[in-house]
Swiss-Prot record:
GO molecular function, one term: oxidoreductase activity
Species, as recorded: Rickettsia prowazekii (strain Madrid E)
One Pfam family hit: Pyr_redox_2
Name used for this protein in its record: Uncharacterized protein RP006
SUPFAM superfamilies: Nucleotide-binding domain, Riboflavin synthase domain-like
NCBIfam families: PRK06567.1
Length: 706
């Protein structure tokens, strides 16, 4: 697994050796150089892959073991997932891996020997993200050669007893119970981290405020950095990053590179059309900054331009030497500072201030005082030193705030049935190296668990995969044009159709070698479901480039349909219900509501405004935030009528809030929800001003791309 680690990824051995008393031998750099020199040789890649199968230095298992016919489901293809898959394949097991992200097929024949690896490599600035590798793909910056991910894929995909399914997530397209029913002998959780932590301060949801996960996933996995990309992500300078871990450093360096690319691309393609006053101000700002970058003749002048514009600054609540970034990999901190990123210590965020457009304009910080551990005997060595907010505050001007303050592990453990690796295992939480270690140290536990059991599936792996291909692969069944801007999209995806409950939705994407034809992740709610035929019907409205591209899909074309995701709608009984939607009825929802003895009325907007509906029990609203807000204010419903809205916020991963883009401010103690997992909400708690503002986060870019 040296292709996944090495220089600037793994430095545990160097740090553990002499604790910085002198310059250590840089073992990871040596390992990376050996791999690099090997790959330069004719058939060097084949030599490396051979050594991953035949390892003469491993005296206990120099060769892969004989086939066991055990079928193991690995859920996730991040560092833990691809490492565990490798060790399980060496143990002789059949490995089927699933990943909720889209994974683009490799552009070359994986079974044909590669003579010169450099002919297959891409420049990192031009490389289209392929989705394989999880956080290794979207969470690590250009400090690491991501072409290595293609090597890791080859190591796995050249095994006849390995198959992966992308756009398939556990608990969505397939459940744990279904996996066991399909004759999997074991399920291994390698699903990575959970939801990002959010600052509990005012205006945390303002325009210009993002989570680090959102920023990195949109940039690296969505390909926002690529020329002509359909992925929109707007950032402005100065940039404030709140946090102190390695992720905050990655965000800081990437934000500088991306900002330059963003404004240069904008200046080249700018057309003034349908712009608001805010759009015009931002456009002038971007064009002026693009000119400054164009005038910079070298890196030193470029660094001066960044400093003039405010640059990127990391703000940490404690001292630099106590920050996770310094403790885990101080070398990365040195590299980051050398690029011109600033690091401010002892800064505790108190409040985010916004301008007249609802966009962040400044952050108020409290300058904290550090309490020396010698004066606090109860201080624990693994805890961050205590910091106490002071009365000293400072106001920092900024136009982008990125929160990199950690993530929550929401995994519910059942060690009797399943095993857990990487970030979803508290023992190995926190880095790529730990994730790989968890697989190396944990695969034998699976082997011991299986040894006394008989394989559940009696046939060959080819037969096993045939049933999975049918159940898990999503293909276009038919496209019916309804009018110029509306069409019906019917997709064949049997297990997804079976698992769907009304109120949930799906994430649709396509595969294309042409980046201009790639569909951004689109959230679609089914209009109807045919479980027997495995068909899911969607009514799609052309409201942007990605939804327009959906119409160009071909029959039998393979697509990514991840889901069903989100929370299902609670189906009541014996109630009077009104569904307010478009003129195209949600046939499936109407049917199931009527089956539960409800009286259902379908209404459109603005026709609904003409009626007095005081006797209605429930109103289900599937419209824009503007219409939903107006309906709430109208006095046409009774006092006890419950108004339920489907919160259509910005979304990206749609995997229970992992990226954090879908954060939505709500009223009450909870303060916010992740709309992709809790999208059906009572209208009373929704902050519509916040929702409408966040939906305009990338407004200017969207107008340009459309």
């Amino acid at each position: 697994m040296v292709a996944a680690t090495g220089h600037r990824i793994c430095n545990d051995c160097s740090k553990a050796c002499i604790y910085q008393k002198q310059d250590p031998v840089n073992i990871p750099l040596i390992e990376s150089n050996i791999l690099e020199e090997t790959l330069k040789l004719p058939y060097g890649l084949e030599i490396y892959i051979l050594l991953t199968r035949w390892n003469p230095l491993n005296i206990y298992a120099p060769l892969p073991k004989e086939p066991t016919n055990y079928n193991i489901l690995v859920t996730g293809l991040g560092p833990a997932g691809f490492s565990l898959s490798y060790y399980l394949l060496r143990s002789g097991h059949n490995v089927t891996a699933i990943d909720g992200l889209k994974i683009t097929p490799l552009s070359f024949n994986i079974h044909k020997p590669v003579k010169f690896w450099h002919e297959y490599k891409n420049l990192l600035s031009e490389r289209i993200p392929k989705g394989f590798g999880g956080v290794a793909e979207y969470g690590i910056t250009i400090r690491w050669d991501k072409n290595n991910l293609d090597i890791l894929r080859l190591i796995l995909e050249r095994n006849n007893n390995f198959k992966y399914y992308d756009g398939v997530a556990l608990g969505f397209n397939i459940t744990k119970e279904q996996a066991l029913d399909l004759s999997f002998d074991h399920v291994a959780f390698c699903i990575g981290a959970g939801k990002p932590k959010i600052l509990n301060i005012e205006n945390f949801e303002a325009k210009g405020v993002r989570t680090a996960s959102d920023f990195l996933m949109t940039l690296q996995n969505g390909g926002a950095f690529l020329q002509n990309s359909n992925t929109n992500m707007m950032i402005r300078m100065p940039i404030v990053i709140i946090g102190g871990g390695l992720t905050s450093l990655d965000v800081a360096t990437e934000s500088l590179f991306y900002y330059k690319k963003q404004v240069e691309e904008f200046a080249k393609n700018y057309i003034e059309k349908d712009l608001t006053e805010e759009d015009k101000e931002i456009a002038e700002e971007f064009i002026a900054h693009a000119k400054l970058f164009k005038e910079a003749k070298n890196n030193e002048e470029l660094k001066k331009v960044f400093n003039k514009l405010g640059g990127a600054t990391v703000y940490y609540r404690g001292r630099l030497q106590d920050s996770p970034a310094y403790k885990l990999n101080h070398e990365e901190l040195i590299y980051t500072l050398a690029l011109g990123v600033n690091f401010k210590e002892n800064m505790q965020p108190l409040r985010i201030n916004i301008d007249k457009y609802g966009h962040v304009e400044s952050v108020e910080f409290s300058i904290t005082t550090w309490l020396d551990r010698r004066t606090h005997k109860k201080y624990h060595i693994n805890m961050c030193p205590t910091v106490k907010p002071s009365s000293n505050t400072v106001l920092i001007k900024t136009k982008t705030v990125i929160m990199a303050i950690g993530i929550e592990n929401n995994t519910q453990f059942d060690y009797d049935k399943y095993s857990y690796f990487g970030d979803c295992n508290p023992k190995y939480f926190g880095s790529v190296v730990k994730a790989i270690t968890s697989a190396k140290e944990g695969y034998e536990v699976i082997n011991k668990r299986l040894i006394d059991n008989v394989p559940s599936f009696k046939g060959s792996y080819a037969c096993f995969i045939t049933q999975l291909d049918y159940l898990l692969t999503s293909r276009i069944n038919k496209i019916n044009i309804l009018n110029d801007k509306t069409f019906e999209l019917i997709i064949h995806s049997p297990l997804a159709a079976k698992n769907f409950q009304f109120g949930q939705f799906f994430r649709l994407q396509n595969y294309s070698k042409d980046i201009t034809k790639l569909i951004e992740p689109v959230a679609l709610s089914p209009a109807d479901i045919d479980i027997e035929k495995g068909l899911i019907s969607f009514i799609v409205y052309e409201v942007g480039k990605s939804t327009s591209l959906c119409k160009t899909l071909s029959e039998n074309e393979k697509v990514v349909l991840m889901g069903p995701t989100g929370s299902p709608l609670e189906i009541p009984q014996n109630k009077k219900i009104i569904i307010i939607d478009s003129k195209y009825r949600n046939v499936g929802l109407l049917k199931i509501l009527k089956e539960n003895k409800n009286k259902v009325i379908f209404a459109t907007y603005p026709d609904i405004k003409k009626h007095k509906l005081t006797s209605v029990d429930i109103v289900i609203i599937n419209t824009s935030p503007e219409i939903a807000e107006e309906l709430q204010e109208l006095k046409i419903f009774g006092e006890n009528t419950e108004l339920i809205i489907n919160v259509n916020s910005l979304m990206q991963c749609m995997m229970k809030g992992i990226c954090g883009q879908c954060i939505q401010k709500v009223k009450g103690k909870q303060k916010y929800i992740f709309a992709c997992s809790e999208q059906n909400q009572n209208v009373e708690i929704i902050d519509f001003k916040s929702l409408k503002t966040r939906l305009r986060q990338n407004s200017l870019q969207e107008k340009m791309s459309n």
